[in-house]
Structures are given as structure tokens and as C-alpha cells.
Amino acid sequence: QKNFSLLLRIWSKIAPSYPDWKLEIIGDGALRPALEEEVVQLGLSPSVELSRPTQEMQAVYLHSSIYAMTSRYEGLPMVLIEAQQMGLPIVSFACPCGPRDVIHEGEDGFLIPLGEEDAFVRALRQLMDSEAERQRMGRAARLSSARYDVDTIMAHWIQLFDTLSVTPSSTPIS
């Protein structure tokens, strides 16, 4: 689902041109040994860090410049909202749902047609080449994330319940 092998292939096309940049993948699980081997096979050991899960994700986001997601499918990925809250521009495949609901194309990130590896590379390069673009999209991302704020969501729920409570029922309840 997360398609980390594709992310590593994409990174292998970018890393030689950006020796000061690092790709950090955070997680654990059954696929970790295969990913570790793939990092070595692609010669990416100097530029890829496979980190264990942490409770300090806020610190990770604060030390990041871009959030990249190569998932083939998602629900509503909280990691995208968290990344936006921390002011990170996002590059993600436009899965059938999830990222399309969070990212505004060209404003706070890039939605790449599913499987278009070269387009993903171009979007990452565009952001990596321009700190001003990262900052502009990061500010927009932070503003976009406000729609998921607890107070905003609660206001929508209250409005919905208020509407439902004053709308007469067309079917009597017995």
C-alpha cells in the first residue's frame, strides 16, 4: 500500500543531484528488511534513513522540508493533515480517495497521477530547487489544515445537528 519501493526508485533519480538532501522513511514492519536491502542495492545508504516509529513526530516534521507519499491507496491519511499543520508542502499520488481530499493541487502540494513516476520526480525537484516555493506552499498547507481543527469540525457538527433538529420529519416516528 505505502509503495516505499517506488519512493526509493524515485529518490534514486533525485539523490545524485541533491547530495545535501536526505530521505527519511519512518516505520516498522515485515517489509523493513526488504527495504533495507533495497536501499543498499540502489546505492542510497548515504542519503536514506530508515527510522523506527517515534512519539516525537512533531520534531520530525519540524526538521523536514517536504512530505512525500507514494501510497497506491489511502483512506483519510492523518499524516498528510499533520504534515500540513507543520507547514510542509506535500507531493502525493492522487489515490482514488484520501490525498485528493487534503491537497489542493499547486497551492499546498502536488497531486501526481497514480503511477506517473517521472511527474513525481519533477514535482519533488521543483520543491527542492525553490525554498521560496516550499515556503509559499507550506504557508498554504498550514492554512488548509485549519479545516481539520477540532473547533472547526465541532462547529460543523453543531450546525448539522441544529439543522436536523429544526427540520420537520416527513415520516412520523412510532
List the model feature ranges, each with a label.
Residues P53, R72:
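Aromatic "clamp/platform" in nucleotide-sugar-dependent glycosyltransferases that forms part
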Residues V150-S174:
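C-terminal alpha-helical cap of glycosyltransferases
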